[in-house]
């Protein structure tokens, strides 16, 4: 899937691309699903919920885009921690040239994050879908 991350120019585009990949795989999607509160009290909305219509297996996806310097990278550790409080498994999907090599390494090392270009095979494994 080379080139998909290059097509993403903003966070909303990343959400749309995640939904596009999930739909292609036959998964149901829900956007901005409200579930309780974050560790500091703010409302918690999961960017995208993916549901296998057959097994009902569910995955929450947080989408993080950073095109240049900015705050998305600084918020990642809190996002990873917040996923632990979700009532379902969760994953951070990230894209953009603004993530440093160190942050990419950190994200991948958590086992809770994947670059957009690697999302489809990851979802195939998670949901037990055919491996193409």
Q: Which residues are covered by each model-predicted region?
A:
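Acidic-basic catalytic patches of nuclease active cores, encompassing PD-(D/E)XK
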Residues: 1-37
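Domain-level recognition of nuclease-like catalytic cores that cleave nucleotide substrates
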Residues: 9, 94-132
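Short amphipathic alpha-helical segment that frequently serves as the phosphate-/nucleotide-binding helix
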Residues: 12-16, 43, 76-80
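Glycine-centered loop/turn motif at secondary-structure junctions
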Residues: 23-27, 87, 111
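Active-site metal-binding core of divalent-cation-utilizing nuclease and nuclease-like domains
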Residues: 28-55, 70
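Hydrophobic beta-strand scaffold residues
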Residues: 29, 90, 113-115
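Active-site-proximal loop/turn and secondary-structure-junction residues that shape catalytic pockets
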Residues: 35, 65, 120
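Catalytic cores of nucleic-acid endonucleases
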Residues: 58-59, 64-110
């Amino acid at each position: 899937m080379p080139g998909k991350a290059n097509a993403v120019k903003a966070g909303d585009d990343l959400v749309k691309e995640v939904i596009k990949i999930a739909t292609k795989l036959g998964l149901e999607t829900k956007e901005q699903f409200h579930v309780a509160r974050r560790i500091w009290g703010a409302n918690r909305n999961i960017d995208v919920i993916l549901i296998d219509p057959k097994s009902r297996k569910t995955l929450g996806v947080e989408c993080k885009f950073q095109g240049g310097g900015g705050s998305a990278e600084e918020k990642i550790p809190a996002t990873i921690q917040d996923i632990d409080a979700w009532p379902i498994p969760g994953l951070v999907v990230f894209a953009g040239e603004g993530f440093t090599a160190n942050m990419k390494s950190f994200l991948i090392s958590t086992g809770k994050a994947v670059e957009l270009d690697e999302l489809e095979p990851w979802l195939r494994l998670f949901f037990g879908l055919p491996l193409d």
